[in-house]
Amino acid sequence: EMDLSAISSVIDIGGGSGTILVGLRERRPQIAATLMELPTVAAVAPDILSEYGADDVVVEEGDITVAPSIGRHDLAILKAVVQVLPPDQARSSILNAARCLTPGGEIAIAGWGVVDDDRLGPPEGVFLNLTFLNLYRHGESYTEGQYRAWMTEAGFRDISRSRLTDGSTLFRARLTG
């Protein structure tokens, strides 16, 4: 569980309907929340958020592989985003996510399909690597080393990788500054 006590603003990048933000705001209602999504998803997100009483979540149309958010936030969440992008877009999504953060802000990248640097484990990462190769034009599971290199290039430090209870991976890091 993340300590959100120092977080006043969060952006969920590629967050679909925004339910992660709804859950965060149930725990910390004072957090300012922004959902950044592609235009087709951003168009329907406000209605879904309204059903949860989260009308004050800002919905921003955008593509993190092209440009950062217009605002600055203490925490950027990318769940099941980086894993489905080609390598150049995966890298640019992390670089642009860093540009969405305040100095010292945090990034949380969560999802399935991360493999060890030798690409031999964990088993679910290897399985998803094969799946991604078949589903996406440039699909592959990225290694821990690739994530660390992209985050380091973007200015992150204190990079950690942990395994969540569902078996997925969570990378966390803090922006220098």
Predicted segment positions?
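Alpha-helical subdomain
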Residues: L4-S5, S9, I13-G177
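Phosphate/ATP-binding catalytic cores across multiple sugar-kinase/actin-like superfamilies
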Residues: E1
